[in-house]
């Protein structure tokens, strides 16, 4: 019996037991979190156990070291060196394989001219035409069953001008090489195409060019490897549908990592990035976008280097892609279910998938069945007189305490906005922790204050029922969102899981009441309110408790007395000050009322019909009331808390650094933090009012620490820097001044940093900082002249870009007023790969340009010196982007056709039609090499000294990236 007494004491609903169980729960969640984030680092293949995998990893790491030795954007000569190295490696791997073929776009001089929407801004109405000369390297491995739909594996080998491209996308490229090496040894059943593509960074152009290749007709599926962060684990960022998600589930058995929350966030444009997967998806392919996703403040900076990543990160991407490609290459695929997928992994051990449409149907079932069951059980318990009636004060305690916590949270968020709005960039844990502790602490204080004056029995069960009602409302709203989005809101699944488990807990309580001991009188109110100065328990309840005490066996007497003492000791209403209302929360009884209620019989041992309850029935009731809370706790707290915490962490981990990208992103991150902390708090709120003083003291202490860290600590450090965008602009139409543009977040960050630069503080250079859109700040100053070319004389910037008008018939008398105007330009640019022409008419709202022609020079076909590509657009063309490979080819030859104003508005009475038909052309040409030198008058000088100065003298709490596709932009303008 002593063991039983200990067991009952440990499991009884007491403050200490509850607090200990909460501690254990959160400790387990913390350990699982650490395990999830660290386990992949311990799974590298060992040479003695997996020699083939070890060789693939070591070879890939060596390849990565070579291709990330320098910056290699499309606009640099280093880009060609990376291309040549990859081509050499591809030829080495394929060797004399009978089923392998290699195609080099650079050798075949492949180019495309096409119209595209801005791939990084879907809301843009700017009509863009792009000319691109490709240097993609494609490899075809013909499968044993070539009639099966093929698989494309893709990664891009260009970097941005300010990054080495280790993660973006060097790891993807060397993973493709490893996959190629593996499949050469293990011939696939279906045909595989490998696309080592170029110039993803400035328009996803390598992927677009793929569909100009005849091999594109062989592939239906795609695995795109990308890096939109700087290391960590490679996540299944998005996938086409439920079928492809299940293929990932079936193939990636070791260290799966994916979450459809990322997919919803990406499609909702909370992340301002894109990958080649967008192009493949738009062209009807189905597949998987596997990418690194954090941290974004190192993404596209000098820290995207091999020093800031690891073999563990490389192996995670390589092994994931290898498992997936091997499965797809060798198995028949079930691709019937093309509805969007909800998916997530459990600490890298198990991957779960459900169709978003199926989830919606289940939500509908939950929404319909759960209230019917709950109401039915309520009616049964009321009919059996086992329902405990609650006052309106009792019903409002839980929701009002939750509302008060949200209000306090909102007030605190206002303090964050005023004092430290970018704090999430440094560490999102502290603000989330502050929000979370605010909610639970406010709930604790209000519920216990209410219970002090108006005691309520069974507050826990009432709160669980109210939580069920709140979650039912939330699930109704989210289900509507899921349906209206055509099932693309794939990140809402955690709420369905939370609702299901909370519903089970609430139904169990209602079921216990419905099946409870029947009485002949309705139970009175269980909660003392301001309308009554006595407890209104029915006589039957009190007599029944008395009978229970009389009928207990003698050998259980000591245990029973201990239990009763613990109940009174832990009661939420017992206090040393104020009214002494000792409410037995499990038995629904105010012990003090027994002395004052005239309905209480003088003899508790009365043998009346109402008191004739068996010892067995009372024992069962006591057993339920003692231990049922554990079942409710285990249903509501551990699993929902882990899933909700993990979901919030997933969101914040991907988005916290986006606060640097504008005030809108800052608001989004703050909003996600507030809502996320409420969701994390909800599972424990029905229980938290009963924790002991140590737990609540630690909660208050954690809030004070979190709040101070959130409000007072500087948001940027060496490991979490502020990312600033750089460009140096030279407008030849306004002189040769080399104006440096530095773009970053408002908040007195940029100007103090710039004022400390030697070239500024020793020359009194003026810095002009102005606010631009979306909470950003642009600072401009005249910087040191760039040295873009090697020369034996003085560098003349004006000679870098020259525009020659070869033909223009706007004022020709031979042209009819109704005839389109035609002009031909020769754009002379030295050692350049990228330029942009922008067309604008001062007298027409839309661009009048309807046709663009690009005249190409083919090195392999000198007899066909001018090969033309032409594109037409009825809606007008605003911009022409030019990308060429040959640095020695110093000209772009362009033809432009535009409509006269007479054709667009039909105003024949306008006497200035000639002037109104003028077309303004703005030219911008880009240079992206900075980590190299030019030789000027026999002396080696840095190409972009203004950028070098920023890198060398700015505090380590700043990182730098390019504002546009080049670091130096030379501009000019003409009127045709």
From Swiss-Prot:
InterPro entries named in the record: Fxna-like_M28_dom (IPR048024), M28_fam (IPR045175), Peptidase_M28 (IPR007484), PFF1_C (IPR053975), PFF1_TM (IPR053976)
Organism in which the protein naturally occurs: Saccharomyces cerevisiae (strain ATCC 204508 / S288c) (Baker's yeast)
Organism superkingdom: Eukaryota
Cytoplasmic topological segments: 1-15, 381-392, 450-461, 518-627, 690-692
Residue ranges, annotated region (Disordered): 528-610
Skewed-composition ranges (Basic and acidic residues): 582-601
Biological process per Gene Ontology, one example term: proteolysis
Residues glycosylated per entry: 96, 121, 189, 217, 656, 768, 796, 811, 866, 937
PTM annotation: N-glycosylated.
Protein name: Vacuolar membrane protease
Topology relative to the membrane: Multi-pass membrane protein
Subcellular location: Vacuole membrane
